[in-house]
Amino acid sequence: MTSTLFFSLEKKNWIAYWNRALVFLFITTYFLGGITRYKHLIVILMTITTIVYLCKRPKHYLSLFKTCLFGSVAILTIAALLSLLQSPDAGASMKEIFKAIIENTLLCTIAIPVILRDEKREDVEKIVFFSFISALGLRCFSELIAYYKDYQQGVMPFADYRHRSISDSMVFLFPALLNLWLIKSAKYRISFAVLSVIFIFLILGTLSRGAWLSVLVIGLIWILMFKQWKLLLVG
């Protein structure tokens, strides 16, 4: 009896770690370039895991498909597939549809909720939050390496627009950086300070006024929502 319970708990823990690792890796690597092969591997593993879970306990996950979000994404996917009938290059169109809708939007709508179905709400929030923070950290690290390589070739920062491509991902990940400030712990405040300095340098290096304005507006809205006046004074 005891041994059966032990192995049952071990199996549940293994499954929980597997689920969390898949979601963490998917979010963390999403904004990185040059690792497409590994991204596809993660997507394949998530898809297989989702199919296995749905086949084993279909009723357990049925409520996830009774939402307006899933219905909207399903309609979008069907409409995109029907558009192939009018496309002059069905192969190229299918490739873009698979990448933009099926692999990203549909996967996020189905796979992530299914994989994290048995997790507590607090645990899901932590997984998603630290995944975005890790994604921001890796994005900043990879971009600093790019700046270092440019410097070795005699290209100084803010010299041209070659780093503008990171604007969208930096703006998208900015709220995660702001929420790091809400964790009242010395090590997290230090992490916030270090990441903030790097973030400011990189976002200025994009030379994108649209990105600057977006970060400013997001920051002001966040400060007003959470009433973090000290952060406003520091800024």
What positions do the PLM features span?
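Alpha-helical transmembrane segments of multi-pass inner-membrane proteins
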Residues: 123-151, 161-235
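Aromatic-anchored transmembrane helix interface
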Residues: 68-76, 90-115, 126-129, 136, ...
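Hydrophobic cores of alpha-helical transmembrane segments in multi-pass inner/ER membrane proteins
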Residues: 45-50, 104-113, 168-180
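Transmembrane signal-anchor hairpin modules in multi-pass inner-membrane enzymes, especially those
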Residues: 1-92, 116-126, 130, 181-190, ...
